[in-house]
Every structure is written in structure tokens, then in C-alpha cells.
């Protein structure tokens, strides 16, 4: 009972503790808020004072400028007077004096201190006022010489007979309107020293208390009348101290004349008492608030002492009973709503904890997977029934069983690692003939490791399935590689005869005369091109399956791509009677950054499909670039719509499957390998884009391609050499060419093509023959085949560069479409790689490249 009373008495001191918290925690925070408020208020006051300074400075300078602008306007107007011009001829001084007297009487506020006129020889007239300021004729001549150009105001400090005088001087030319001759110059001068009228004007119009004009901190003029509680010296002292919260606010305004900052400065004086009073009131308000907070803290202590402590002690007694585990009790309630809520919540929490303890025990005991707890010294502490069953342990006396000892020996190294703090997952340790995958995790209590929990899973079946999967995967990889090797070999074997077919067909075009023969040759060319396209589709699909398709992004003009596509397919559509509409909304001066080759392949496949399956009607291709604010990439959207045969909506999902067309009759009627759309879908995925399709039977088809791209302003490049130059006119002289080709047909075609360019061609049937010819003869160009007997094309190229040390340009020709082959040729020293079958246009492009890179450098 004594202990309880002692505890209650101790808990009642919480009121004092809370009061201390209020004072030691809340009070500094509130005090900080007050200080911050004072600081910000002071900053606001300072900013307001600074703003007042800026506004007053700008206003006083504007008034100063406007005053001299008015004098300038009068000066310009007077200089055009006929009276002044007549003076230069008749020298009638009385008329001129009367003229200026009348002007001064009409507007005395904008009258200069003195005036004088000059001609090309010197001063011819002055109004006599200059002598009142100590300015004699010599000084007037000096002023005329110093203000010798433009018609702006000039600040001048001169030493006169009565001391230094600071003045603004301006001149304007006197022109003869009939001849435009400059008769002379009119000068106006405003003396700033003791210019009380100017000071009064600035004071009254700027609404300040007083104005002082200084030059290099020396006062020149002021508006003080003598009854102020300060003098000019006080104004200068406050200007240098810059006390923003002083009773007297002095604002300094440098005078800029003709865009040049002068030594002149205007000091304006304003009463700042209201700002100082506001600051004092704010400080007093802060002190009153602090006193109020102290009183509130003391009153809060008394209230807490009487109302809160007893209720809190009841709540603490309930928590102590739960901690001592003397049995679960119900909370008796509290008069304070918050304490009652806390007690009820604790009651629910204790119930949940008790239920969780039971759940954890059940989870541990009834789990089907073995679970064990080990000490950091690798001593078994506890295991669940599933672990006992697998380890053949019925009670703790059977831990010497061989199965358990073998398991412990293999698990111990991992237990030691976990005891160092490591968490291990996926550790395979068998129990008998079964393989278990174990996870080991250290149990941390207050930062120290108190044990290790080990959980296992039987993966015997999974391991066996993984072995079978690996065997099947290796077999599939072998099969895929064999198919790839077969396709690569067939590519070379098929391209070689296609090269002969297309080459001879292109040569025949130039030798036949009748239209019928030309049509027959066109059929031959189109058939060969179709066969080549089917072969390319099959090879591309094979590369996609093997993941050998490379994406190489670079900037290019999408408008050029659309123009090329239109040039190719518009004649085809015209001959077929199908309307081709191309709408390109991209700016011609914008380049996009993506893989140009793959994008071309996507567009050409889609347009080719549309042309193929649209017997009548139209094909519409629309492209636009969608840009989003803040996004790194833009989105290229290409929509292709045709009025072709379409496809059933339930078969749209099959469109992108390889070797699939809607009906077998479609292949017979329209042709195709069924790979075009498969390649399109895979290329779009590789470019991180999306393709959507809408179609109905007989209602046409719409494809929508969206690709993320980067765009930028197009850099204009110099025009390349035209590819329309006739072959015989491309080279200025006959070139000597070495052709290395083992196939007679290919050699015949290439020789025929080269003759059109007036080339002298030597033919070597393999690499060894080529090496012999190069040892004895100098050539301008080498055309190198890939698969050669005895010594391959890549090896021959390497020998020419490394052993013969020849720099002769080597242009390789290969039927192998693999990028690795092209890279190997370039690494061996080739300068250019062409793909068979060699077309006349492709060969022409290669020769144009050769001329630009090597013949231009040679000249």
C-alpha cells in the first residue's frame, strides 16, 4: 500500500513536468515565433523604407529631368526664331535683348541663368548675366569649347572669380532654313550653386520636407529655411550612416546627365517618426505576449494538477498490471475522454497481442515447412513438428541421429555467417535424399543478435524440373542456331543467282528497243525484287527471333523519308488506279531522333501491304508530332488508312502472327509471305512504341503507329553530289578497278556495270589471285566479294592492309545480311560494304561515295 501511495505521489508531479515542458519547450518556440515575427516585421518596415527611398529617388530625378527638359524645349524652340537668325546678319542687340526678355517674363520658372551666342569665330553676344556668377568672357569661350558637340546637357565645374561654380550647359545650332547653313550656336547655362528656386521646385513637387544638392559631399544648394531641428551638416551625416529607422530619413539620388553619372547628388529629407513609433509598439506588444504566456503556463499547471494527474495514474496502474502478466483485466474507464480512449485502445491491443501470440504458436507448430531456431553458437534451440519429422527426431534426446548430425554439419557454415549479421536466402542443404532450400535470418533484439531463424522448403521436384528445362532449352538453342545457320547459308546461295537475274535484267533494259520487250524485262525485275523481299522478310524474322536486330538511333529528316516513300509508291498507285494521299504535318526543318532504317522498314511494310490489298479506292497516310510540356520525348503518330479488302474483326489478333493471312485464297490472290506485319509489330516494340489496328471485312483497314522520339531543329547540310549524273559522266578519267569475285555470273554483271563508267576492270577469281595482281599493278579501286575459295574476302582485305600495306579503297560486296559480317569487313580495312544482289542504283551510290571520299581528296 505504501508503494502505491508513493507511486501516486510521484505521478502527481506530472503537472510540474508539463508546466516545465510548456515553459522549456513551448515558450522558446513561441518566443522564436515572436522573434521571427519581429524580424519579418522589421524586414517589411525596412523594405517599405527602401521602397520609399527608391520611389522618392525616382520621383526627384524625374522632376529634375523634367525641369531641364522644359528648358531644353524652350531652348530648341527659341533657336529657330527669326529674331536670332536676323541677329547674325544685322547684329541688332536691342532687338535680341528684348526678344529674350519677353521670353523670360512669359515663363520665368524655366529661364536659364545666362545665355550667349557664338558664330564660327567666337562669342558674338551674351545676356550679361554670366558676370553675376563670376563668369567672364574667357570662361565663356572655355564653355563654348567644352560643349562642342551634340545638343545634350553637359555638367561642367569651372573656377570663376568668385569661386567654383557647378553648372549644366547646353548648345543648339542656329540654321539658315533656306540654305541649311549653320550660322552659329546658342548656349544656355543653369548655375546650380545656391539655386534656391530649383531646390524649392524639387521640394514642392516631390512632397518632401527639404532638398539638399551636393557635389562630392560638398553642399551646393538647399531648401532649408533655418527653423528645422537639423541643419545641412546633420543631413550629410545621416546620409553617410544610412539609418533606415532613424527619425530623419535621408534619401540619396545620384544625378545622371546625358547617360553619365555625375558627382552631383540630391539629398531629400523626410520625417520618419511614424516608422520608429511602429517599431516601438511592436516590441511592447511582444513583451506583453510573453508575460501573457507565462501567466497561461502557471494557470495550466494548476488545472493539470487538479484534473489530469489522478486520471493518468489510474491509466498507468492498468498498464502496469498488463506488463506484470497477472492476467488480462478490463480497463475501468476514465472521466477524461482521451484517457478513456487510450485505456480502451490498450485493452483492445492487449487482446490482439494475446491472440497473436497464440497465432504465432499455431503457425510455428502447424507449418508444413520445417522451421528451426538456432543460437549464435549453432546450438539448436527449438524446431517445429515438420522439422522434427524430416530430421527423424521425436524428442530432444534423439539429436544424435545420423540424419540430424549430417544436416547440422552442412548447415553450420551458413549458421556462422548468419551469426555475423548476414541474411542468407536460397541455401540448398539436403536432408537425406531430399533437397531443401533454406533461408537464414538473424534475430535482432536491441541491436544484438540473439538467435537465428531457419526456414526450409522442399525443392526436390523443382530441381529435377529445372534440370529437364535446361536440357530442353539447350536443345531449343541448338535447333534455333541450326535454323539461323541454314537461313544464313540459304541467304547467300539464293542471293547469288538473284544477283545474276537482276543484274542481267538491268543490263537488258538499256539494250532492248520494243515496249513489249521492256515490259517483259520489267516483269523479270519485279519478280526478282519480290523474291528478294520475301527472302529479306524471312531473314529479318529470323534475326528478331534470335534477338540480333540492332537499334541504332540518330537524327534525320522525317520529311525526306515521307518524300522518298511518296516517290516510290505514287507511280505504283497511279498505275493501279488507287489514290495515294500523304499528309505530313511535321515541320520540314525539324529532325527526329530514332532508328531511321527501322522506321523506314515499318512505313514501307505498311504502305506496301496497303497497296497490295487495296484493289480500288484510296490510301491515306497521315503523320504528326505530338509534343507534351515538360516531357523528355515527343510522340510520332503515323496513321495509315486504306479502303482495301479488310479483315474480320475476330481475326485481328492473328494479324501479327508469323506466316499468317486471313484466308489461304488471300495468299494465292495477293501474294506475300505473311511476315510483313510480324516484323512491323516487333520493330515497333523494339522502338518502345505501340501499334493499333482497326478493320472490317470489305471496309478497309487503319493502322496507328505511335513512337517516342526526340525532335530538334534541323541542321541544314550541304547538298550531296547528285545521284542523277549519268554513269559515263561521273568520272573525269578512266579508272583501273580490280574485281575479286569467284562467281562468273556476278563477275560478268559487275564488269558490265563498270564499263558504263568507262572503267578498266581486271578480274581475280579468288583472294590469292588478287594478292598477286596487287603486287604488280596499281589500282584505283578494289571490289571485293566475301565468300572466296582459298582465301576469303575478309581475310584478303586484312592481308592487303597489313602485309601489302596498300591504302587502295576497298568496296566489299556480300550476300550475308548479318551485321557481324559488315563489321568484320570494316574492321579488316574495307571502306564500304554493299549487299547483294548488287543493283545499279546501289552501285552508283557506292561510286558517288568513292568519288567524294577519295577522288576529291586526291585532287
UniProtKB/Swiss-Prot annotation:
GO cellular component: plasma membrane
MF GO annotations: ATP binding; histidine phosphotransfer kinase activity; phosphoprotein phosphatase activity; phosphorelay sensor kinase activity
Subcellular location: Cell inner membrane
EC numbers for this chain: 2.7.13.3, 3.1.3.-
A Pfam family assignment: HisKA
Membrane topology: Multi-pass membrane protein
Modified residues (4-aspartylphosphate): 785
Membrane-spanning ranges: 15-35, 280-300
Keywords tagged on the record: ATP-binding, Cell inner membrane, Cell membrane, Hydrolase, Kinase, Membrane, Nucleotide-binding, Phosphoprotein, Protein phosphatase, Transferase, Transmembrane, Transmembrane helix, Two-component regulatory system
SUPFAM superfamilies assigned to the protein according to its UniProt record, in alphabetical order: ATPase domain of HSP90 chaperone/DNA topoisomerase II/histidine kinase, CheY-like, Homodimeric domain of signal transducing histidine kinase, Sensory domain-like
UniProt catalytic activity: ATP + protein L-histidine = ADP + protein N-phospho-L-histidine
Domain Response regulatory, chain residue ranges per copy: 736-851
Domain Histidine kinase: 489-711
Gene3D superfamilies noted in UniProt: 1.10.287.130, 3.40.50.2300, Histidine kinase-like ATPase, C-terminal domain, LuxQ periplasmic domain, C-terminal subdomain, LuxQ periplasmic domain, N-terminal subdomain, PAS domain
Phosphohistidine sites (modified residues): 492
Keyword Ribosomal protein: no
Complexes and interactors: Binds the complex formed by AI-2 and LuxP.
Function: At low cell density, in absence of AI-2 (autoinducer 2), LuxQ has a kinase activity and autophosphorylates on a histidine residue. The phosphoryl group is then transferred to an aspartate residue in the response regulator domain. The phosphoryl group is transferred to LuxU, and ultimately to LuxO. At high cell density, in the presence of AI-2, the kinase activity is inactivated, and the response regulator domain has a phosphatase activity.
Protein name, entry field: Autoinducer 2 sensor kinase/phosphatase LuxQ
Lineage of the organism: Bacteria, Pseudomonadati, Pseudomonadota, Gammaproteobacteria, Vibrionales
Amino acid at each position: 500500500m505504501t508503494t502505491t501511495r508513493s507511486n501516486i505521489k510521484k505521478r502527481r508531479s506530472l503537472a510540474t513536468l508539463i508546466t516545465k515542458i510548456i515553459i522549456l519547450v513551448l515558450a522558446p518556440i513561441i518566443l522564436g515565433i515572436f522573434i521571427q515575427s519581429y524580424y519579418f516585421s522589421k524586414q517589411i518596415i525596412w523594405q517599405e523604407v527602401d521602397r520609399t527611398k527608391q520611389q522618392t529617388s525616382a520621383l526627384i530625378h524625374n522632376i529634375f529631368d523634367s525641369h531641364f527638359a522644359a528648358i531644353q524645349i524652350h531652348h530648341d524652340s527659341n533657336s529657330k526664331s527669326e529674331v536670332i537668325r536676323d541677329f547674325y546678319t544685322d547684329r541688332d542687340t536691342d532687338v535680341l535683348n528684348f526678344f529674350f526678355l519677353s521670353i523670360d517674363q512669359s515663363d520665368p520658372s524655366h529661364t536659364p541663368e545666362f545665355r550667349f551666342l557664338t558664330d564660327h569665330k567666337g562669342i558674338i553676344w551674351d545676356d550679361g548675366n554670366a558676370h553675376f556668377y563670376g563668369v567672364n568672357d574667357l570662361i565663356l569661350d572655355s564653355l563654348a569649347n567644352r560643349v562642342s558637340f551634340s545638343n545634350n546637357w553637359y555638367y561642367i565645374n569651372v573656377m570663376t572669380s568668385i569661386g567654383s561654380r557647378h553648372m549644366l550647359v547646353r548648345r543648339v545650332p542656329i540654321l539658315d532654313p533656306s540654305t541649311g547653313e549653320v550660322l552659329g550656336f546658342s548656349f544656355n547655362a543653369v548655375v546650380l550653386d545656391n539655386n534656391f528656386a530649383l531646390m524649392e521646385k524639387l521640394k514642392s513637387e516631390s512632397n518632401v520636407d527639404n532638398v539638399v544638392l551636393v557635389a562630392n559631399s560638398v553642399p551646393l544648394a538647399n531648401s532649408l529655411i533655418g527653423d528645422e531641428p537639423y541643419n545641412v551638416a546633420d543631413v550629410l551625416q545621416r546620409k553617410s550612416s544610412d539609418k533606415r529607422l532613424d527619425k530623419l530619413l535621408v534619401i540619396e539620388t545620384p544625378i545622371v546627365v546625358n547617360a553619365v553619372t555625375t558627382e552631383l547628388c540630391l539629398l531629400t529629407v523626410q520625417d520618419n517618426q511614424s516608422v520608429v513609433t511602429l517599431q516601438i509598439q511592436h516590441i511592447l506588444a511582444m513583451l506583453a505576449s510573453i508575460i501573457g504566456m507565462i501567466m497561461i503556463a502557471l494557470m495550466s499547471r494548476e488545472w493539470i494538477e487538479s484534473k489530469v494527474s489522478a486520471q493518468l495514474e489510474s491509466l498507468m496502474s492498468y498498464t502496469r498490471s498488463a506488463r506484470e502478466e497477472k492476467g488480462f483485466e478490463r480497463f475501468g474507464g476514465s472521466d477524461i475522454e482521451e484517457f478513456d480512449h487510450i485505456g480502451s485502445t490498450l485493452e483492445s491491443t492487449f487482446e490482439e497481442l494475446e491472440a497473436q501470440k497464440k497465432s504465432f504458436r499455431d503457425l510455428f507448430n502447424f507449418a508444413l515447412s520445417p522451421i528451426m531456431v538456432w543460437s549464435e553458437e549453432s546450438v539448436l534451440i527449438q524446431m517445429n513438428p515438420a522439422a522434427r519429422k524430416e530430421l527423424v527426431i521425436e524428442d530432444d534426446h534423439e539429436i544424435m541421429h545420423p540424419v540430424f548430425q549430417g544436416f547440422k554439419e552442412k548447415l553450420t557454415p551458413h549458421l556462422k555467417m548468419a551469426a555475423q549479421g548476414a541474411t542468407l536466402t536460397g541455401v540448398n542443404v539436403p536432408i537425406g535424399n531430399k533437397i531443401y532450400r533454406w533461408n537464414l535470418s538473424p534475430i535482432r533484439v536491441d541491436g544484438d543478435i540473439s538467435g537465428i531463424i531457419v526456414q526450409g522448403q522442399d525443392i526436390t521436384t523443382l530441381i529435377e524440373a529445372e534440370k529437364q528445362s535446361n536440357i530442353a532449352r539447350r536443345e531449343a538453342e541448338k535447333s534455333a542456331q541450326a535454323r539461323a545457320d541454314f537461313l544464313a547459308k540459304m541467304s547467300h546461295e539464293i542471293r547469288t543467282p538473284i544477283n545474276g537475274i537482276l543484274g542481267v535484267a538491268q543490263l537488258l533494259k538499256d539494250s532492248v528497243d520494243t515496249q513489249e520487250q521492256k515490259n517483259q524485262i520489267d516483269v523479270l525485275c519485279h519478280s526478282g525484287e519480290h523474291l528478294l523481299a520475301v527472302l529479306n522478310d524471312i531473314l529479318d524474322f529470323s534475326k528478331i527471333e534470335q534477338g540480333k536486330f540492332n537499334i541504332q538511333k540518330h537524327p534525320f529528316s522525317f520529311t525526306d523519308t515521307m518524300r522518298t516513300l511518296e516517290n516510290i509508291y505514287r507511280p505504283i498507285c497511279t498505275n493501279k488506279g488507287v489514290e495515294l494521299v500523304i499528309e505530313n504535318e511535321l515541320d520540314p526543318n525539324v529532325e527526329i531522333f530514332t532508328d531511321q532504317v527501322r522506321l523506314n522498314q515499318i512505313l514501307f511494310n505498311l504502305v506496301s501491304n496497303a497497296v497490295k490489298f487495296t484493289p480500288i479506292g484510296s490510301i491515306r497516310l497521315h503523320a504528326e508530332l505530338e509534343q507534351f510540356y515538360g516531357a523528355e520525348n515527343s510522340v510520332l503518330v503515323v496513321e495509315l488508312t486504306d479502303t482495301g479488302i479488310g479483315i474480320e474483326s475476330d481475326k485481328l489478333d492473328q494479324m501479327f502472327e508469323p506466316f499468317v493471312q486471313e484466308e489461304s485464297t488471300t495468299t494465292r490472290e495477293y501474294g506475300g509471305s505473311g511476315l510483313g506485319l510480324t516484323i512491323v509489330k516487333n520493330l515497333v516494340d523494339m522502338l518502345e512504341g505501340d501499334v493499333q489496328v482497326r478493320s472490317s471485312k470489305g471496309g478497309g483497314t487503319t493502322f496507328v503507329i505511335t513512337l517516342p522520339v526526340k525532335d530538334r531543329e534541323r541542321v541544314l547540310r550541304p547538298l550531296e553530289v547528285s545521284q542523277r549524273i549519268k554513269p559515263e559522266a561521273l568520272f573525269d578519267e578512266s579508272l583501273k578497278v580490280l574485281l575479286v569475285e569467284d562467281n562468273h555470273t556476278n563477275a560478268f554483271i559487275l564488269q558490265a556495270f563498270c564499263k558504263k563508267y568507262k572503267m578498266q576492270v581486271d578480274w581475280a577469281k579468288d583472294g590469292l589471285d588478287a594478292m598477286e595482281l596487287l603486287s604488280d599493278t596499281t589500282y584505283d579501286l578494289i571490289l571485293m566479294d566475301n565468300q572466296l575459295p582459298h582465301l576469303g574476302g575478309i581475310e584478303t582485305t586484312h592481308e592487303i592492309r597489313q602485309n601489302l600495306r596498300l591504302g587502295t579503297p576497298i568496296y566489299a560486296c556480300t550476300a550475308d545480311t548479318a551485321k557481324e559480317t559488315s563489321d568484320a569487313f570494316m574492321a579488316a580495312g574495307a571502306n564500304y560494304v554493299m549487299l547483294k544482289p548488287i543493283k545499279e542504283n546501289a552501285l552508283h551510290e557506292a561510286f558517288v561515295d568513292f568519288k567524294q571520299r577519295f577522288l576529291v581528296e586526291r585532287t
